[in-house]
Structures are given as C-alpha cells and as structure tokens.
UniProtKB/Swiss-Prot annotation:
GO MF annotation terms: DNA binding; orotate phosphoribosyltransferase activity
Presence of the UniProt keyword Metal-binding in the record: no
Annotated Pfam families: Pribosyltran (PF00156)
Protein name: Transcriptional regulator GfcR
Gene (name only): gfcR
Source species: Methanocorpusculum labreanum (strain ATCC 43576 / DSM 4855 / Z)
Coiled-coil residue spans: none
Alphabetic keyword roster: DNA-binding, Transcription, Transcription regulation
UniProt note: domains: Contains an N-terminal DNA-binding winged helix-turn-helix domain and a C-terminal regulatory domain (or effector binding domain) resembling phosphoribosyltransferase (PRT) domain.
Amino acid sequence: MSSLEELMAKAKDLHAEGHSSGQIADELSLSVDTVTWLLTQGKAGIAAPKDVHIDWTNVSSNTTLLGGISSMMLAHFEAANEEEEGVDAVIGISVSGVPLATMIAAEDGLNLAIYHPSKHNPEGKIGSISGNFSKVSQKRCLIVDDCITTGNTLTEIVNYLRRHKATPVGICVIFDKRGVKEIEGVPVYSLFTIKRID
C-alpha cells in the first residue's frame, strides 16, 4: 500500500468513526480541502490539492519529547521577545496545540486557555474558548498549535481574541506550511518551515 493509499485509509477510518473533516484535518496535519479530496478521491474531475502530510506521532506520543519540543517553542518565542512585555496566558488550539500549550504554560507558570475552532463545531459557525480554563479578556496571549496549514484557524483565533479584549502577542507552531511571518499582524514563531517544491 502506498503512503497516499494509507493516508486515504486513515481519513476514511476516522470519518467512519464519526470525525468531522476539520477533526480529520487536525489529526492528519492536513487542510480540510485535502481531507475532502482524500474522502472523495476517485470522483472524476477533482484535482488533488497541494499539501504535505506531517506525521509527528513519534514526538507527540512521547511526553519527554513533547516537553522538549515545547521548551524549544518557548525558547524561540522568548529569544525574539526579550524586550517585550510578558505573556499572561497560553492558548492551545484544540486538539494538537493543547498538550504543547499545557507544557509551555507549566514551564513558565502561566495561565492556560483552550480554543475550540469553528471547524470542530458540527454547524461550523464559530469557535470558542473553553469555559473550564483561563479567561482571556484583558490578557496578553500566546497562541500555540502544532502546524499552520492554511492559516484559517489562527486568523479565526486572533480575531476572536481581539473581539474579546485580549491581546494576541505571538503564534508559536512547530511546522509552518505557508512560510508566513505574521497572521493578522501577530508574529509567527515556527520551528520548521515546510515548503513544497513542484
């Protein structure tokens, strides 16, 4: 079985388990468009989107390695912001950004918030901050996720934070598939930039 066939099988298995396209996209570190293509592949006239699959489960499933990469993310952000005011809260994007944000918040003794993006909402209307964690209003917030694929989720949370009177001060990711320096004026701090060469 080819890696494409394996990816299609994973997407179809997750879909059969009841996951939404947005949840599958997060699980496989792909765009929603790519997941849609994987689920409908074989239908005439649908061209494959340009995307890159990143499998980082060797790190994400090992708390020692996950802690190490979280520390690297925090160190990268802090090195670029030595003169700036601090951060009050770290916000993890559900699902993969949550463990990273938790470890970063614990390392620096910061509040933790969790954002559920609109793509996880069955109606797909709006995203929200979990009420079980830190409030974000009037706080300087560091946003954490595993990967920038399209940037839509990060644009969504930046706008959400501003509407709720919070100040997004940075976006930390492990992988950036877009090669962006900022999203909506908020600086991006990525450990790795992934570029597709066609």
